[in-house]
Amino acid sequence: MIKYTVLPEQKKVIAIVTDCEDDVIKTIAKNMPENLYFNEGAYKLKHSYKGIAKCHPDDEFDEDLGKKIARNRALIKYKFAYLRKIDLFSMGLLKWILDTGEKGDTCAQYIESLALELKDKTKTE
């Protein structure tokens, strides 16, 4: 939701994107398997993001233009934070996959070495 505050005497418009702290968590939960657990607190956004449009003193104040500019500035901040959290989650997931794969390879190598050891023991007996 975007809320606007118009201050014509200051030739200023403020736009605030609100109620967005759980947006990343909702995206992750919607797109991942139900049995995937993650630390939700690490992916929370701020409660709001603010954009401000200030009119030059020599220019004529235009409320609609000010709203568009302030809205875009607020959304840029919000989207940048959102994408940073998605990237953080993606990197964590990728690291987990790679770590799991490495552990799996290590486990497979260990089993293979035990099998070779057992094979060598049976040859000598």
Question: Where are these predicted regions, by residue range?
Answer:
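Catalytic phosphate/metal-binding cores of nucleic-acid and nucleotide-processing enzymes, i.e., regions
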Residues: M1-T124
